[in-house]
């Protein structure tokens, strides 16, 4: 087996950034170490596992505990150069025998959440340990038990000290996962600044809202626009999608999994990009087109001598302020164009779309 202590970064534009490991990979390695110690009395350190795509990382143990009828092992999560809130958290697995014929049971220990709402991959009442980490732990436990001629009847409790506090920085409270973080991962590898985890959470948020029968959801580009929309609707937490810059992540998923009504709320600059047709609103992946803003302003009645000032403006907000200074409304037309982009992306899905444009203070500039 190859000793791969750091996952390869296959994105040449981010070759200098270091990848890391998911909580699911850490939990699997900790479980392997704990079960091995439970059977043999010895902890493998480092402990290697095989990830779904064949990588073979080795993990140093940060914690070992062996008692009467149980074993515990802990690994400090290394997320590489990704700004992951779980980076540095200790993932602890406690393993002990279960009654004959029970199979493998997963439990949430300190700092690991419990699912309370329908719509997620794990049913309510279960530990928030996602399917792939469950499968990885199950397969490795079954293989170890088979090697020693033992039945794989085990209780695996995953704990993360401080996880309840960490979870407040995640989507878990809105998804109805209480008490801590989730044990996640589909490949075992964390890619720095990957969009996939964020978009996955948006999808799970839509799933939860649909399962709850919610007919109206809100996607906002930030907290200011979210607060402005919530002042109008006071939607339940699980109806608020953490859209951020990923308008496309919301709209494309709703295309296949519709909800009756979607409100998109955002600042003027972000929604100008949506009006232009951009679905990723991040500043590094889409830019405001001043020529587009001039066309909007011209149609709204802006005089010709304003064209150069708009084209040379530093920001979208500067353009907005210029037009406001002469009583020209461009926020309304931007909202209409943004709505057209959303409807085009939905491709006829039965979703009613509302757009709310706000300024930096949260004042509503347009609502269509």
UniProtKB/Swiss-Prot annotation:
| Keyword check for Membrane | no
Its UniProt pathway annotation is: Cofactor biosynthesis; adenosylcobalamin biosynthesis; cob(II)yrinate a,c-diamide from sirohydrochlorin (anaerobic route): step 6/10
Class of enzymatic activity (EC top level): transferase
Q: Which reaction does it catalyse?
A: Co-precorrin-5B + S-adenosyl-L-methionine = Co-precorrin-6A + S-adenosyl-L-homocysteine
Domain of life of the organism in this record?
Answer: Bacteria
Q: Which Pfam families match?
A: CbiD
User: A Gene Ontology molecular-function term?
Assistant: cobalt-precorrin-5B C1-methyltransferase activity
GO BP annotations listed: anaerobic cobalamin biosynthetic process; methylation
Q: What is its EC number?
A: 2.1.1.195
Q: Which UniProt keywords apply?
A: Cobalamin biosynthesis, Methyltransferase, S-adenosyl-L-methionine, Transferase
* Family of the protein in this entry: Belongs to the CbiD family.
Q: Tell me the PANTHER family matching this sequence.
A: COBALT-PRECORRIN-5B C(1)-METHYLTRANSFERASE
- NCBIfam families in alphabetical order: cbiD, PRK00075.1-1
Q: What is the designated name of this protein? A: Cobalt-precorrin-5B C(1)-methyltransferase
Q: Which organism is it from?
A: Brucella canis (strain ATCC 23365 / NCTC 10854 / RM-666)
